[in-house]
């Protein structure tokens, strides 16, 4: 509940909510179904607001969540919220579809809705390297243990490859809406 006399237009003060740190919950909880529920809730906490409302919490690190006993989430620190235009959100969704279906025309359309002006074939190829990495967990409709996911080293190597390829083609100026 908000505490009005301690809040301003720029500061929201609320009553205390109960919950434990994410890692504490994971270490304490033996029930695999409850852990899977937490994973699904964290997934939904990110994707549902973005895909349905065009809003993201711009600081989604583990310190900004506490977990209730039922694996429900308490989301903390709303200091970095970003609202996106519907065409940008539809571009994100269509880029996922383009990567999944290997549809280059749809990828071009998606990048244009993101704000990239006249993306070249080579630029699309390079950006799709990164997009494929980002969308990889969503491209297969199955439960995927974290141990099966690429390591942080793989992410770094992918980012380095994209950076190198972008330099080769003269760089790219990310559209304003693309940068948080």
Residue ranges and their predicted role:
Residues 1-9:
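Short beta-strand micro-motifs within the conserved protein kinase catalytic domain, predominantly
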Residues 7-8, 17-19, 24-41, 68-180:
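Helix-rich C-lobe and terminal helical cap/extension of kinase-like folds
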Residues 13, 61, 77:
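Residue-level signature of catalytic and energy-coupling elements of molecular machines
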Residues 14, 47, 108:
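Short glycine-/small-residue-rich flexible loop motifs, especially phosphate/cofactor-binding loops
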Residues 37-53:
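Conserved helicase/translocase P-loop NTPase motor core
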Residues 54, 59-61:
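Conserved catalytic-loop position in the HRD/HxD motif
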Residues 63-67:
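Hydrophobic residue at the +6 position relative to the catalytic HRD Asp in the kinase catalytic loop
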């Amino acid at each position: 509940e908000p505490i009005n006399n301690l809040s301003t237009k720029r500061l929201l003060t609320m009553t205390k909510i109960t919950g434990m740190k994410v890692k504490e919950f994971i270490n304490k909880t033996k029930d695999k179904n409850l852990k899977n529920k937490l994973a699904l809730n964290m997934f939904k906490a990110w994707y549902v607001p973005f895909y349905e409302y065009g809003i993201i919490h711009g600081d989604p690190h583990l310190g900004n969540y506490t977990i209730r006993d039922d694996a429900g989430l308490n989301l903390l620190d709303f200091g970095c919220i970003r609202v996106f235009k519907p065409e940008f959100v539809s571009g994100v969704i269509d880029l996922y579809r383009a990567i999944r279906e290997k549809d280059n025309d749809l990828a071009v359309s998606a990048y244009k809705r993101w704000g990239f002006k006249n993306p070249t074939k080579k630029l699309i190829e390079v950006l799709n390297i990164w997009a494929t990495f980002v969308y990889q967990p969503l491209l297969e409709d199955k439960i995927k243990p974290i141990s099966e996911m690429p390591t942080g080293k793989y992410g770094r190597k992918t980012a380095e490859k994209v950076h190198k390829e972008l330099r080769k083609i003269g760089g790219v100026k990310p559209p304003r809406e693309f940068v948080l």
